[in-house]
């Protein structure tokens, strides 16, 4: 194993462990709903609070050029440790919704230091094969996001202990960063603080179109991740019970989300061989089709529902890394970290709307139609990437493979 791939392995491990914080509360929502008497709005709020905190964290990071002015490694480990602390505080000392919302918001702010800086560190190790490398990193993020569902699905741990397990995993990730993760030989030039760069990185058409493609992807992704567990549980209830090939809804959710790591790997390979725009358009077309059709399996044969959900879980994340890779290839080198952070901030702002939208849609139109509202994202994303492909600047992508 080369040094670059060893570093990618370590960075991916750290990211997997750290991102277990993200959906830790979402994984225990049924228990929280029973104990605290949560309304659907309150349950959605616990997920949206993390998104909102992440947005604020990435916005502050972008406005201060934090990942370009300071060591991305330092930003990453500090963010992970603080996120673990806020998550553990919820488990240890919170007994009602509003303090939980505040701490979930704080966890989101801290996680802004875990994700974008990791992409920048990885980019210092890879020029060739960067799409595959970022794909593997996002795959680790995917498995990490699903981990609380695994803990909940295969153990009898109460919800507080489940959150503490997630915090312990995150601290282990910070230790990996501290002891073994380093910057690579292809370092981006240091930057001085310049508040204008947070917006200026998207002043040119090509990065802006890549960002629009990313927005379409994000409209769909986090709403699916947030509510697929509820969909799978409700589908079994509608049928009168049963399981997904012996798996309960929580364990099935872990399988659906975690298998997205395969999509990240395949998407990375396809992107480096076929080009960024081609691979992202294919992935969004497939995931959009799944969003449009999975509702028709609701209450039907569990294996059919699980199969469509797995295909959706794989294709919905397959393109994610390629939008980030495109930004690293299209943006000014000195401000790649700021560009990634700004893109991420805008994308996560949009997820708050789609996450909030699903519960009222499910209540009014039923689960059969709720996820269909997500198809607009990949449809517009395909259009944006097709327009990017037609620009002269797209020749910078993948060494000329658009």
Protein language model features and the residues they cover:
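Structural signature of the two symmetry-related core transmembrane helices
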Residues: 74-88, 278-293, 372
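C-terminal transmembrane helical hairpin of 12-TM major facilitator-type secondary transporters
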Residues: 274-326
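Flexible cytoplasmic inter-helical loops of multi-pass small-molecule transporters
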Residues: 179-200, 394-401
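Helix-loop-helix hairpin linking two adjacent transmembrane segments in secondary transporters
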Residues: 128, 136-181
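Cytoplasmic helix-loop-helix junction between adjacent transmembrane helices
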Residues: 103-139
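Hydrophobic core of transmembrane alpha-helices in multi-pass small-molecule transporters
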Residues: 16, 86, 98-113, 302-318
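Extracytoplasmic gate region of multi-pass secondary transporters
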Residues: 25-26, 206-261, 324, 354
């Amino acid at each position: 194993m080369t040094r670059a791939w060893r570093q990618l392995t370590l960075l991916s491990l750290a990211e997997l462990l750290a991102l277990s914080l993200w959906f830790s509360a979402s994984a225990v929502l049924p228990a929280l709903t029973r104990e605290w008497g949560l309304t659907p709005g309150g349950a959605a709020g616990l997920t949206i609070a993390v998104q909102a905190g992440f947005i604020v964290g990435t916005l502050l990071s972008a406005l201060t050029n934090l990942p370009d002015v300071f060591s991305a490694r330092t930003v990453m480990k500090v963010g992970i440790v603080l996120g673990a602390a806020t998550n553990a505080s919820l488990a240890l000392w919170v007994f009602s919704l509003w303090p939980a919302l505040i701490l979930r918001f704080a966890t989101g702010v801290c996680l802004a230091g875990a994700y974008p800086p990791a992409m920048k560190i990885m980019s210092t190790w890879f020029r060739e094969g960067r799409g595959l490398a970022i794909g593997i990193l996002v795959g680790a993020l995917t498995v990490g996001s699903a981990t609380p569902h695994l803990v909940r699905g295969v153990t009898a741990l109460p919800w507080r202990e489940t959150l503490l397990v997630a915090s312990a995993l995150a601290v282990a990730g910070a230790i990996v960063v501290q002891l073994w993760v380093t910057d690579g030989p292809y370092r981006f030039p240091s930057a001085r603080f310049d508040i204008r760069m947070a917006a200026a990185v998207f002043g040119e058409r090509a990065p802006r179109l890549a960002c629009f493609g990313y927005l379409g992807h994000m409209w769909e992704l986090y709403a699916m991740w947030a509510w697929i567990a509820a969909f799978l549980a409700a589908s079994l209830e509608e049928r009168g019970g049963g399981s997904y090939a012996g798996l309960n809804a929580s364990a099935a959710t872990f399988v659906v989300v975690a298998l997205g790591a395969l999509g990240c790997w395949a998407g990375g390979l396809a992107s480096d061989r076929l080009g960024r725009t081609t691979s992202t358009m294919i992935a969004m077309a497939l995931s959009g089709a799944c969003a449009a059709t999975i509702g028709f399996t609701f209450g039907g044969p569990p294996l059919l529902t699980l199969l469509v959900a797995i295909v959706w879980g794989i294709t919905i994340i397959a393109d994610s890394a390629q939008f980030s890779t495109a930004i690293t290839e299209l943006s000014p080198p000195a401000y790649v970290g700021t560009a990634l952070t700004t893109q991420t901030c805008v994308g996560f702002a949009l997820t708050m709307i789609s996450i909030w939208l699903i519960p009222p849609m499910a209540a009014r139109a039923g689960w059969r139609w709720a996820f269909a509202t997500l198809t607009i994202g990949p449809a517009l994303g395909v259009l944006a990437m097709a327009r990017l492909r037609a620009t002269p600047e797209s020749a910078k992508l993948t060494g000329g493979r658009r």
